[in-house]
Amino acid sequence: MQISISLQGQSKIIYQIFRSYYENAVLDLPQDIELREFAYQPFNSDTYVRHLTFSSVDELRSFILSNVPLHLYFSAARYQIPSAKEMEQKGWLGSDLLFDLDADDICEINVRRFCSGMEILSETCDGEVREISEITVDCINRVFENALVLKDILIQDFGLKPRIFFSGNRGFHIRVDCYNEWANLDSEDRREIAEYIMSPSPPYESNSESGPGWLGRFARGINGVKIDEQVTVDPKRLVRIPGSLNGKAGLKVIEIVNDKFEYDEYLSPFEGIVAFQSNLSGKFNVLGHEIQLRRGEITKLSAKTGVYLALKGYGVIKAHVR
């Protein structure tokens, strides 16, 4: 049984840590904020609240501080009436182009199983089974390398201006802000783009690594990029707001500039230290460094690491000091 990402039964301390962050958070919002649908997932809930609208950044911030989000989104689409409950009533005005790359699709994830806090290699367990998926620096770097290839495709083959964002967990989003004919692409048009990226078919072979488009990429050993096709195909998809927190890991959704990215605890914006009580025993790879935990033992950790561990189901935070 995989650990739920819900915070039901989790300490309220994380809620307060998130709220403190949002008091001064800088959110990267579109200029046409009034045309976007907003959505969020509250703490202690597995469902989303959708069809929200805001006319200004200040109005959104006030809402966030009263309704602290575990996850926060806006729509890739623009609407005449974004608050309408039914999609056909919203009045679609076009959408940005989205791509999603996730570690699950690109790396072999190391899934470790625990029974009553101790790691097990067999299927036998008389107690609760917990599964922990460890993400390594090498894995995230591989996903990022794929994101850079996709960025190059969008620039060189389509003449677009893509932006890469770290998802705040274990992947990357690429967004192209569209305000022209690209915004009006329907699902089938977007599917063709996704297929061009995932399963390219050059008209002939070439040994020239500097050749145009997929001819050169094939010569360099690049045979396609694995993306979540459904994200690209759906013009009414929700996308994480840059500057918000990903409630699966407590890391910040950030734009990648200068094509440089490092996967470490500094992706977390939290300050101070926490008293963390582990539910598991063992050595773990956490945000690029190894950590030793013992079940039931309270350990002093940085808030950056402690919040990540708590959200991933390793244990609970007992206290936080800024």
Swiss-Prot record:
Record NCBIfam families: PRK00419.1-3
Keyword Manganese recorded: yes
Record's subunit section: Heterodimer of a small subunit (PriS) and a large subunit (PriL).
Gene: priS
Job of this protein: Catalytic subunit of DNA primase, an RNA polymerase that catalyzes the synthesis of short RNA molecules used as primers for DNA polymerase during DNA replication. The small subunit contains the primase catalytic core and has DNA synthesis activity on its own. Binding to the large subunit stabilizes and modulates the activity, increasing the rate of DNA synthesis while decreasing the length of the DNA fragments, and conferring RNA synthesis capability. The DNA polymerase activity may enable DNA primase to also catalyze primer extension after primer synthesis. May also play a role in DNA repair.
Enzyme class: transferase
E.C. numbers: 2.7.7.-
Signal peptide: none
Family: Belongs to the eukaryotic-type primase small subunit family.
The protein's name in its UniProt record: DNA primase small subunit PriS
CDD domains: AE_Prim_S
GO MF entries: DNA-directed RNA polymerase activity; metal ion binding
Names of the cofactor(s): Mg(2+); Mn(2+)
Protein's GO biological process: DNA replication, synthesis of primer
A GO cellular component entry from the record: DNA-directed RNA polymerase complex
